[in-house]
Amino acid sequence: VKEKNGTWSLPGGWVDINQSIKTNTEKEVKEEAGLNVKAIRIIAIQDRNLHNIPPYAYNVCKVFVLCEIESGYFRPNIETDESAYFGLEELPILAKEKNNEEQIKMCFSAYYDRNWQVLFD
């Protein structure tokens, strides 16, 4: 999704109180990309400060989740201006505080590998 500052990121956000990782992932994709998805498996759990810049003064675990699209379509909203799909060779300018090229490549690899094993720091 295209952020308000013009950079791009995977849909995501903080897990809300009383939400599981699964339900929160599905909610965030709906809010930011307009898609109804089914979260099907965890790709990775990463320490944000080991993979993203700038570092935070506190620790955050980032959970990457593989989803299947069920329905829906994008509508501009308060968080995102646009939604699009990109191949690895055509990535736009990324919101590196949210996800970087290494993380996008990891997600592509997990999508294509039915035997993917969860990565974690």
Language model features with spans:
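Active-site-adjacent beta-strand/loop module that shapes the phosphate/pyrophosphate-binding cleft
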Residues: 46-73
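Nudix hydrolase/Nudix homology domain
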Residues: 7-8, 78-121
